[in-house]
């Protein structure tokens, strides 16, 4: 395609994502073969997976349930009737030489999600991204190339059909994304939603979630779309962002140099941080779709839809809004707490047990999250139970212990659990909040540091911090800091 006509308009990227989500069923989409990951090659295959003559596929009903729930969470319209089609292409990882997918009658269409975008150097903003469709299909096998990471240049290739026939939900966004960051945040939100639903683990390293990016550039928002390029081989959200950013600049430079953009599929090379040409891009006509004669129409009744909708959990975006609007949390804390459902569940249990939401959020997103992540633990199995953290937060909030004391006992609580109050009482760690006791210690300190007292009264008021530090040292951090500051201020001023 020729370069767009030069105008005063800045270049704008137009990005859409095709997200392939492996549905977390125990058996494959059309057969009882296992979906277990990481086992020896070609151990989870059977005549249906291999496409042997005389075999017939049977739709796994759990796949249909998961696909419909995913579609509902993405605000898609569920089709009462849909069908499966055969997508014809010849490649070693496809044992039947066709893939069972959905072409013109998918299970769901026309939805949207809200994405929170944190662009570097800019304010966080919300953006609604349209979703074209969600359809079910089977995954292909996996090729391992010897001597190269690609077919070209390899000495030979091995094929593992364990993945062939695993259920996929393909989610196709509308071309509403404009930056690499938006694309990465959109993909991240899709994974977050799938994990909340429990329909997929979304593990990108294991291929449970894979994204293909379609990207073009144009002169301004009113200009027609440019030539679309597909990018594959991105195994992280940061790779999605970097691949988009690189490709946007590559296309702009090509147009400005008068070079055409070719409709093609390109691979993201993580080591070189660039995209490189893989093959020309096929169109729908190249696949010669036709209805699969071995599979009947798919029907989803109103009762089924109502039943499955009732089982949906509160989703991440709704949680973020509730945490900010009802609990008064910052956007940042709401985002961090809702990133993983187990963390959100833990936080909510702490609040239900009586803790102040903001204080609980500070502890969970800080010290507790660091401990869980560094030790690769789950919140469900953390020895420090939500009600115990709530007890500790209440001790701090009620002035019974200081934050310093809480930090001192926290490692033991994280490792073994137990009652924070019992530990505080047993070790005499409670806050000193008796004014007379604190006043006596202050008098002692002022008497021991006459030069500093004179300097303070001479205008060096920052020395109050020195006395606070000495007081905390003397009391082992147990003095009520607010009361201590009040008494110190009064005494220092004479």
From Swiss-Prot:
EC number, as in UniProt: 6.3.5.-
Pfam family, one: GatB_Yqey
Example of a GO MF term: glutaminyl-tRNA synthase (glutamine-hydrolyzing) activity
Keywords of the record: ATP-binding, Ligase, Nucleotide-binding, Protein biosynthesis
Recorded superkingdom: Bacteria
GO biological process terms held by the UniProt record: glutaminyl-tRNAGln biosynthesis via transamidation; translation
Gene3D superfamilies (UniProt xref): 1.10.10.410, GatB domain, N-terminal subdomain
Catalyzed reaction equations: L-glutamyl-tRNA(Gln) + L-glutamine + ATP + H2O = L-glutaminyl-tRNA(Gln) + L-glutamate + ADP + phosphate + H(+); L-aspartyl-tRNA(Asn) + L-glutamine + ATP + H2O = L-asparaginyl-tRNA(Asn) + L-glutamate + ADP + phosphate + 2 H(+)
Keyword Protein biosynthesis: yes
InterPro entries per the UniProt record, alphabetical: Asn/Gln-tRNA_amidoTrfase_suB/E, Asn/Gln-tRNA_Trfase_suB/E_cat, Asn/Gln_amidotransferase, Asn/Gln_tRNA_amidoTrase-B-like, GatB, GatB_C_1, GatB_Yqey_C_2, Gln-tRNA_amidoTrfase_suB_CS
Family of the protein in this entry: Belongs to the GatB/GatE family. GatB subfamily.
Described function: Allows the formation of correctly charged Asn-tRNA(Asn) or Gln-tRNA(Gln) through the transamidation of misacylated Asp-tRNA(Asn) or Glu-tRNA(Gln) in organisms which lack either or both of asparaginyl-tRNA or glutaminyl-tRNA synthetases. The reaction takes place in the presence of glutamine and ATP through an activated phospho-Asp-tRNA(Asn) or phospho-Glu-tRNA(Gln).
Quaternary context: Heterotrimer of A, B and C subunits.
Descriptive protein name: Aspartyl/glutamyl-tRNA(Asn/Gln) amidotransferase subunit B
Lineage of the organism: Bacteria, Bacillati, Cyanobacteriota, Cyanophyceae, Synechococcales
Gene from which this protein is expressed: gatB
């Amino acid at each position: 395609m020729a370069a767009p006509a030069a105008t005063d308009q800045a270049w704008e990227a137009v990005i859409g994502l095709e997200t392939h989500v492996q549905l977390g069923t125990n058996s494959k989409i059309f057969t009882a073969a296992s979906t277990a990951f990481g086992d020896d090659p070609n151990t989870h295959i059977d005549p249906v997976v291999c496409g042997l003559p005389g075999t017939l596929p049977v739709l796994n009903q759990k796949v249909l349930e998961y696909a419909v729930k995913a579609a509902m969470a993405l605000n898609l319209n569920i089709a009462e009737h849909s069908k499966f089609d055969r997508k014809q292409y010849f490649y070693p990882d496809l044992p039947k030489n066709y893939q069972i997918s959905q072409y013109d009658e998918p299970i769901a269409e026309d939805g949207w999600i809200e994405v929170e975008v944190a662009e570097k150097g800019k304010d966080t903003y919300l953006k609604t991204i349209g979703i074209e469709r969600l359809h079910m299909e089977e995954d292909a096998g996996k090729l391992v190339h010897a001597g190269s990471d690609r077919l070209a240049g390899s000495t030979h290739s091995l094929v593992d059909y364990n993945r062939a026939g695993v259920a996929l939900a393909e989610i196709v966004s509308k071309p509403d994304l404009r930056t690499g960051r938006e694309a990465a945040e959109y993909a991240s939100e899709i994974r977050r939603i799938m994990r909340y639903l429990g329909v997929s683990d979304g593990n990108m390293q294991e291929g449970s979630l894979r994204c293909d990016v379609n990207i073009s550039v144009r002169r301004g928002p009113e200009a027609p779309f440019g030539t679309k390029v597909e990018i594959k081989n991105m195994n992280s959200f940061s790779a999605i962002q970097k691949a988009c950013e690189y490709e946007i600049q590559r296309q702009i430079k090509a147009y400005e140099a008068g070079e055409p953009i070719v409709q093609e599929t390109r691979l993201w090379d993580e080591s070189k941080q660039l995209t490189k040409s893989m093959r020309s891009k096929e169109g729908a006509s190249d696949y010669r779709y036709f209805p699969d004669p071995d599979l009947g129409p798919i029907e989803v009744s109103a009762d089924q839809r109502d039943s499955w909708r009732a089982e949906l959990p509160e989703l991440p975006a709704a949680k973020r809004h509730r945490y900010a609007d009802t609990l008064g949390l910052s956007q940042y804390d709401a985002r961090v707490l809702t990133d993983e459902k187990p963390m959100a569940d833990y936080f909510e249990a702490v609040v239900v047990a009586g803790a102040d939401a903001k204080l609980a959020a500070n502890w969970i997103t800080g010290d507790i999250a660091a401990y869980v992540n560094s030790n690769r633990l789950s919140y469900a199995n953390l020895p420090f139970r939500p009600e115990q953290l709530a007890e500790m937060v209440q001790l701090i909030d009620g002035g019974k212990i200081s934050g310093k004391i809480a930090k001192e006992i926290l490692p033991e609580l994280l490792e073994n659990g137990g009652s924070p109050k019992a530990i505080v009482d047993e070790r005499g760690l409670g806050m000193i909040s008796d004014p007379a006791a604190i006043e006596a210690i202050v008098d002692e300190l002022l008497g021991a540091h006459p030069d500093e007292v004179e300097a303070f009264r001479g205008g060096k008021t920052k020395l109050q911090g020195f006395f606070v530090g000495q007081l905390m040292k003397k009391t082992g951090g147990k003095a009520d800091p607010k009361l201590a500051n009040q008494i110190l201020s009064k005494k220092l001023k004479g």
